[in-house]
Amino acid sequence: MPERTGLKILDMISRGAKVIDLEHDRFPGMPAFDPVKPAMEYFLYRQHENSYSTSQEKRRSSSSGLIVMTDQSGTHLDALCHQAYDMKMFDGTPINSDVETPWGFKKHDSAEIPPIIRKGVLVDCTELLGDPLPENHEVTLKEFQSVIKQEGVSFGKEDVILLRTGYGKYWNDFSKYRNAAGVSGEVSKFLSDKCYAVGADNLAWDVPGKVDSDSGVIQPGHLHLIAKSGIYIMENLFLEELAKTRTYEFLFIALPLKMRGTTGTPIRPVAIL
């Protein structure tokens, strides 16, 4: 009987394969794109101090918390309902009251996103443009292709592309992180039929607020990739440890939460080398 792929992965890990965490920690006040603030709040509504009593025979106590968080914060994946073009999603689904409700979306929400287990490709633009890239720089298609050539990598329609700007190291310094470099519209348009998902170590994949001269919109990557092509975007990835390995092709795993109706979901992405 052929050995199953999952067991092969376990064998790889037992033999020393590296598992690299690509998620940032989450906390109240963490960096967030302005329209989705506050990103997260957390409260302990049950505390050990209030439930403990010396009169109890076993003296067990409990504590529980409440998380209040936007679905577009932290290390996350955009669902395909997150963007539309002329009030239609990538597959022509119209945005109307049957699809978009006050309680969430009925189609292309986060609950529909499958586990992502695919080849990952790191495009580390810092090797060409400096670490980190200049503030608010938009990676051009020429620069993107130069990095790919320099790394010697290839990718196809079923693969995941992770682009590093070097700003992930500033996760705890929002004054720097908010000015991270991003990806130009021409790169996103180029990738719109060439991959399964993309991600970057910044707030929005794109550079927030910059108008794309070709499409006339801000965040052109969200237009070309999600709204027009049905390609997932991941944001706020932590790529620093992966970059240190100088490994540009790897097994990528990200598990979205099955949250009905939501426009995005937290993920715990890892790279297995």
Q: What would you call each of these model-derived segments?
A:
Residues 1-273:
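Active-/binding-site microenvironments in catalytic and ligand-binding cores
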